[in-house]
Structures are given as C-alpha cells and as structure tokens.
Amino acid sequence: LYCKEHGILPDGRLDQNRMDDESAESFFSQTSVGTYVPRTLMVDLEPGVLESIKTGKYRELYHPGQLISGKEDAANNYARGHYTVGKEIIEPVMEQIRRMADNCDGLQGFLIYHSFGGGTGSGFASLMMDRLAAEFGKKSKLEFSVYPAPKIATAVVEPYNSILTTHTTLDYSDCSFLVDNEAIYDMCRNLGIQRPYYTDINRIIAQVVSSITASLRFPGSLNVDLTEFQTNLVPYPRIHFPLVAYSPMLSKEKAAHEKLSVQEITNACFEPQSQMVRCDTRKGKYMACCLLFRGDVNPKDANTATANVKAKRTNQFVEWCPTGFKVGINSRKPTVLDGEAMAEVSRAVCALSNTTAISEAWKRLNNKFDLMFSKRAFVH
C-alpha cells in the first residue's frame, strides 16, 4: 500500500509520473542507483513466512539483510521467543536496526507491528522492545498489536502470551494501537467478503495504519507527528492504548450510491462497526481524542463536525480532561490496492480515542488467563 501511495514499483523504481515527489523519503531510503528500499526490518523465528516474501512479487524491493529469520519457530511459547530461540537472533536484529538508524537524517522513532498471541509476536517483540528502550531511550515507540479475538483463537495459550508481553512492554512503549481480529472479520463481512483471508484482514489494517502515518509522509494543512500522538493521547504513561476507528468502510457496490460528507464519516467513527477492538464506548469515558482526516476535507468542515460530535454528549469525557479534539488534516486521499474489496473514496477519517472502554478487552483477557492459570494449564 505504501508503495502504491508513493508511486514505487515492485522493483523499487519510482514511477515516471512521480519523479518530483519527495514524500517517499520518510519511509523509504534511496540507493545510489536511484531505487527505493523500505526502512523496514522483518523478523520471524521460523523461515517459512519470510521465504514467501523473498520469492514473491516484491522480492526485489527488500534488501536481503532486512529479512531476518531463525531456524525454528517459538511454538506459540512466550518463553521460547523471549529467552531461548529469540536470544539467538537478537544481536543480528539489533545490528541491522543500528545500521538503518544511522541511515536516517533525523530518526523520530519506531513503529513496531506484532501480535500478542504467538510466541514470536509476544516473546521476541518484548525482548526487542527491551533492547530498543536501552539503546534508543528517547525515541518514540509506537506499537500496532494484533490482539487475541474473543472467538477466533489461533493458539490455546494466547492469554498467557498476551499478558506476559503486555507486562513486559508496558513501560517501553509510548503508544499502542490494538487491532482485534474479530472486529476486522466483521468489517470484512460488511464489505461483502464472506470468507476473509489474511490478505483481506491485512489490507484493512494497512488502510488504518496508512491514515495514522499519512501526516508523517505527506504534506498537509494540519499534520501530526510521532511525539504529538503521545502528547495528545496519553495522559499517563501506562494508559497508552487508544481505541482506533476508521470510516468510511464501504464496499464498491455501496460506494456508488453514497456520497459521504465530513459530518457523516465523523459520526460513523463513533459507531461500534468502525472500531478496531470490540468494546462498548457508551459505557466508558474519553480521556482524549484525535481525529485524522485525509482527502477532500477543509478545516471548517472538520471543526464543525467535531463540534457537533461534542454537542451530542453521547461521548462522555472525564472531568479532569478538557473535551478537546485534536484534529489532523492531510490532503492526500486514501489509496486502494487492485483487487481490494474496499471502495476508493475521496475522504476518510481515522479516530484515535483514549477511552476507559478499552478496559473491556483487558478484562476478557484477564479472565481467560485466570481461568487457565487456576487449573495450572500448560504450566511446567
């Protein structure tokens, strides 16, 4: 998705029509021969998944040193990812991170994508966060974490892994955006995808991540940088799990019959079907809210829409926090990939809300953890 947004072809060359566009520089580095390489590092403890990238459509895009894999997986075990198998590859990973950091003109921070439920996503990610905090203490660290869904479990020990990784990373991460597989599955069904594949799920997550990072990559009238997310959304360091919502999520069939105004997409962001995590916001209170608009949006419409949301009073704010909405506006409209079920729209909004309602997600996880641990299931 980033490649399409910045006009970068699968072999790393820039599209001829985008030669004057410098927006790619923040997430891609340019080589001496003029091709672009993503500023990314992909790590997995087992080689299978990364092999598919090395042989896939984008095999020429990545530098071989940016795809690091071990010889055996963590077997859905946090301890293997953190203490045994993960320890074996942490040094080459950190060395590559140092090399990439040196290649940046002004490093702002890190975006970490991982899952809570698996052994690598939980164990190795927390080990790496520990090392990042030690070496790059002052740099922002934003996480995008796939949270175990209530009904869709890929491993029976997910509650153990999730609790352990959250405990470890709580003090190292500045802001953590949770994504719940079940909520994404529901979005896929609304888009008319009856049997979603991982590709469909990842594409929805990619749209959300793209909206959050758009202001880091493209010029806009009201841009938000990495440290501003932290400043505006996190009142206390440990309460750093904003609820993410995205609108509009339209299928191509529906898009032909709807012309969504700024007000309508803003209202939709506060509806349950737009949320990335299953929880009831009416039962919680908001501590902070950030609305990131992109596309054909003028500041006047955005301010009117947020004022109307405030006036409704259905979204309760805590007494000790002003009812301010941080607004970001970026003029680049959302891009959709070929074959994607989601329709191309002229404007979209991503809402990041720090609300007490997200505690529902943690309660579900705690209950499962307690249930298993009380029986000493899988404890050795």
UniProtKB/Swiss-Prot annotation:
According to its UniProt entry, the protein's GO biological process terms are:
microtubule-based process
Give the chief site where it resides. cytoplasm
Instruction: Return the Pfam families for the record.
Output: Tubulin, Tubulin_C
**Which top EC class applies here?**
hydrolase
Q: Does the keyword Phosphoprotein apply?
A: no
Enumerate the GO terms in the molecular function aspect: GTP binding; hydrolase activity; metal ion binding; structural constituent of cytoskeleton
Q: What name does UniProt use for this protein?
A: Tubulin alpha chain
**Which organism's genome codes for this protein?**
Encephalitozoon hellem
